[in-house]
Amino acid sequence: MKYGFAINLHRCIGCRTCTVACKMEHRLSENIQRIRVLNDAGETTYDVPVGEYPNGLSFTWRPVPCQHCDNPVCVEVCPAGATYKREDGIVVVDEEACIGCGQCVAACPYGARQIDPVTPVVQKCSLCFHRLDNGIETTMCQLTCPNRAITVGDLDDPGSDVSKLIAQYGGEQWLAEAGTCPSVYY
């Protein structure tokens, strides 16, 4: 078993329901996001369309959770051993062991980690492993997305919804050239 995401960029409308649901589920501090929604310019603002006025303007949104990489550089650089990869592919932060040094934040090519100034430990998408471990097969971002842009499941199971979507639409890994082998397909 290997958990991962299929995110349909044609369905994402940039509403950030996934971000809000995640904040509420994990009781995150203000300004901490475990999943960011970026526009075409790679920013979290809503005022940067791409194209030419009047008929060619468009917005494309990219939800960016932790990529739960097969080769996670965050695990390699963590001096406390607080970041580790589970057998099911989920990259996890042990908040009790995290020393808040920020080395993993700097190493992540996806910008998927933040240090919470309140706690101060690293925050990142946990793929809602607390839900998955208890038999709830949906993450909060998947459950609440109004356009069903996010699908989570077992990438090793060809019959899973996530694997079927990737097979049907040929999902691409973002920043594949980083060599981390992300488990999120767009």
Identify the meaning behind each predicted range:
Residues 1-186:
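Non-ligating segments of multi-cofactor redox enzymes
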